Design a protein with these regions (language model features):
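Linear, non-domain "peripheral" regions
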Residues: 1-137, 141
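A broadly conserved detector of short glycine/acidic/proline-rich loop/turn motifs that flank catalytic sites
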Residues: 16, 31, 48, 80, ...
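Short low-complexity stretches enriched in small and charged residues
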Residues: 1, 29-38, 156-159, 182-188, ...
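Secondary-structure boundary elements
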Residues: 97-181, 189, 197, 259-261, ...
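Structural beta-strand/beta-sheet cores of well-ordered domains, especially the beta-sheet scaffolds
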Residues: 2, 8, 21-23, 40, ...
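Flexible, active-site-adjacent loop/turn segments at secondary-structure boundaries
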Residues: 12, 16, 25, 42, ...
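Hydrophobic/aromatic-rich core segments of domains that either
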Residues: 138, 153, 185-275
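Helix-biased "structured C-terminal domain" signature
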Residues: 248, 264, 272-301
Length: 301
């Protein structure tokens, strides 16, 4: 058991007071057997006239804020505490039929997994197909766990991480051609790669805890983090982080899951004005382990 505290602050600045449209937030983590939400606090400045909570089609918690006043600065501050149960040594408890690839999902699972199997991005020349099939053993079945772990580490070791300020994700063929991308680009590449093999995969948005850099000033990547899940019969949805080579949920705080990255944007919204009115956006994410923070305080005392 590990208690992690996440402070996520996003600030928009404008040249003059602008009329703010609705803003959609995905800050509240998903409760599950491996992470339990202890506390959640959301402070928005200026204060909205209404905050409306919903569940989206994937069961994610979404808050929608509506504003009345104009403002030259808009700030969202989310603080959460989660009880995290890390899986340090993933054990693929897959059904016997799924221990080696290729395999097929059974008739009970398939209807619910279809949308997560269907590919969402063009690959006219089969570049993704060709790339992922390099990891299959020639002429014989490939152990499923080994295949997915190898693919995860191949992205981590074979591609260059680049923090991109641009919104959205690169198409997977662009990531393969360029050999670089952000965490969301790598997650999407792995999703499309395993989908090309007929496996169900989905996008995950959340936070990353970096133990080696823990402390009051630790910035958990400076932003939100993204990875993916693959559905394995008997094991369920298993986490794979190709940016860091993480298999399982270790150091990953899950906030939202979706079929496509566009459905799991942490914060989005509009304002009435010209593009020149927007001066910029600043995002700061701080992830701290309470046990480590207490140890640090004790050592300095």
């Amino acid at each position: 058991m590990t208690i992690l505290t996440v402070r996520h602050v996003t600030t928009y600045r404008y040249r003059r007071p602008v009329a703010l449209g609705d803003h959609r937030m995905m800050f509240r983590p998903r409760d599950s057997y491996d992470q339990r939400l202890i506390e959640s606090r959301l402070v928005i400045t200026p204060e909205p006239v209404r905050i409306h909570w919903i569940h989206d089609p994937f069961g994610n918690c979404v808050a929608i804020a509506r504003f009345k006043a104009r403002a030259s600065e808009l700030c969202f501050e989310s603080t959460i505490r989660v009880d995290h149960y890390p899986d340090n040594v993933p054990d693929f408890q897959t059904d016997p039929r799924a221990k080696a690839y290729p395999f097929v999902y059974d008739s009970e699972e398939m209807p619910d997994l279809m949308a997560s199997i269907a590919r969402g991005y063009p690959d006219p020349n089969g570049e993704i197909d060709h790339w992922v099939r390099k990891f299959l053993l020639p002429g014989r079945p490939t152990p499923t766990g080994k295949l997915l772990m190898t693919l995860t580490h191949a992205i981590k070791e074979g591609f260059t991480y680049t923090r991109r300020a641009e919104h959205g994700t690169q198409e997977p063929i662009v990531t393969v051609r360029m050999g670089r991308g952000s965490c969301r680009d790598f997650a999407l590449l792995m999703i499309e790669a395993v989908r090309s093999l007929g496996l169900a995969a989905r996008f995950v948005s959340g936070y990353l805890y970096v133990p080696s850099r823990d402390g009051p000033e630790h910035i958990g990547g400076g932003s939100t983090h993204a990875w993916c899940q693959v559905y394995l019969p008997g094991a369920g949805w298993v986490e794979f982080d190709p940016t860091n080579g993480i298999i399982g949920n270790r150091d990953l705080i899950r906030v939202a899951v979706a079929r496509d990255p566009s459905q799991a944007i942490p914060l989005s919204g509009t304002y009435a004005g010209s593009p020149e009115d927007e001066l910029g956006m600043k995002v700061q994410v701080n992830v701290v382990c309470e046990d480590a923070a207490m140890d640090s305080m004790g050592a300095s005392a």
